[in-house]
Regions:
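A structural motif
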Residues: 56-85
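Conserved acidic catalytic loop of the alpha/beta-hydrolase fold
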Residues: 1-10
Length: 184
């Protein structure tokens, strides 16, 4: 649909959306793909453990866990759901595993890709993002850039504008130039 609306399509996504942006970059041609803190694995776990974690989560019964077990339903912002299903995490990690495996054997369809990581990331695996960029670069992929959001306290959700503090405003200093540059 987007291709019919203009001559250059830029796709950007955060977390699970970042994973789907990276998947799209691997399989489809877009002008520029910007994967922001893509959910390719879990922070502090070695990337090679992701397939085993995926299998375990798929085998276990689905449960809903709190994003923050201390704040529970008081977690802000109000428009966000305070829990997540383990089955959704398993399926997202399954997409990540398939993407990483495909990237090891084939170049991405998209020639211009930016992966943005948060140096104070607490949720997703920056190591997995670096591994994916390395796989793409090993195939001589066009332009694969790694950019980093720096200077934030430990966090994952760096773009939520209603979150207390200045996370989003500070993250936008890195993100907006990348997104504005997408038109080149």
């Amino acid at each position: 649909i987007a291709r019919g609306l203009g001559t250059a399509v830029t796709v950007a996504g955060f977390s699970l959306g970042g994973l789907l942006t990276a998947w799209l970059a691997q399989h489809e041609v877009v002008h520029h793909a910007v994967a922001i803190a893509p959910f390719l694995g879990v922070a502090r776990l070695h990337p090679r453990t992701t397939p085993a974690l995926t299998a375990a989560l798929r085998a276990l019964p689905n449960v809903f866990l709190w994003w923050n077990p201390l704040l529970r339903e008081r977690l802000m912002p109000d428009h966000g759901y305070p829990r997540f299903p383990t089955r959704a995490i398993a399926e997202a990690l399954g997409i990540a595993n398939a993407l990483t495996a495909h990237a090891r054997v084939a170049p991405p369809a998209t020639r211009r890709i930016t992966i943005v990581t948060n140096t104070s990331e607490t949720g997703v695996s920056n190591a997995s993002a670096h591994e994916l960029a390395g796989a793409w670069r090993a195939h001589g992929a066009g332009e694969v850039e790694l950019a980093h959001i720096t200077g934030l306290p430990p966090s994952h959700d760096v773009i939520e504008p209603l979150r207390p503090g200045t996370h989003a405003r500070r993250a936008y200093r890195t993100l907006l130039p990348i997104l504005h540059d997408a038109r080149r």
